[in-house]
Curated annotation (Swiss-Prot):
Name listed for the protein in its UniProt record: Small ribosomal subunit protein uS5
This protein's GO CC annotations: small ribosomal subunit
Keywords assigned by UniProt, alphabetized: Ribonucleoprotein, Ribosomal protein, RNA-binding, rRNA-binding
Gene: rpsE
Start-end of Polar residues biased regions: 1-14
Natural source organism: Prochlorococcus marinus (strain MIT 9515)
Domain S5 DRBM: 50-113
GO molecular function: rRNA binding; structural constituent of ribosome
UniProt biased composition (Basic and acidic residues): 24-51
Self-association state and partner proteins as the record states: Part of the 30S ribosomal subunit. Contacts proteins S4 and S8.
Role this protein plays: With S4 and S12 plays an important role in translational accuracy. Located at the back of the 30S subunit body where it stabilizes the conformation of the head with respect to the body.
Residues covered by region (Disordered): 1-51
SUPFAM superfamilies registered for this protein in UniProt: dsRNA-binding domain-like (SSF54768), Ribosomal protein S5 domain 2-like (SSF54211)
Amino acid sequence: MTDTPTKNENQSKADNLPPSNPNDQRKGNRNNDRKRNRRGDSKNERDSEWQERVVQIRRVFKTVKGGKKMSFRAIVVVGNEKGQVGVGVGKAGDVIGAVRKGVSDGKKHLVRVPLTPNNSIPTLSKGRDGAANVLIRPAAPGTGVIAGGSIRTVLELAGIKNVLAKRLGSKTPLNNARAAMVALSQLRTHKSASRERGISLEQLYS
């Protein structure tokens, strides 16, 4: 049978423990605050890299049992102007909620765009979505972004400064934006194109 410590013995052990230093507690709290601030700062820096532009907001109606239910649909283009861009669609009962969902959806559908040293695209490319067809081609430095509507927004947020774009077919902003995304997703650098075709860069240019 083991002897259990009495209440007086426990009290004497507690009395022998060194007193806690309030400075140590403050240091621990400051360290935790610094870690939280660093995490918050890094998240804010990542968010500040991205820009979003609303292409279109429209009211949509859904027929339900009690009548028609109205909501808002927002088409948003998200990009960091460094070769990444995405198009998102959000629906909600209010405009702010629809835009927020559109931004989140756009970040889930990002496309990487290979940029040339003069902030253009390496080759000509075509894209199609529904009845919309988009043709984009590289341009010389100083040309600017020759495009309109949602196509221009996509190209600018991708970081392209010199490009020519032509819209064929549908004028719907969503279809044109998605067609531009398809065209950008098909772009390849000269080096990757020569590697895929199994030829040298000199043969590619000749």
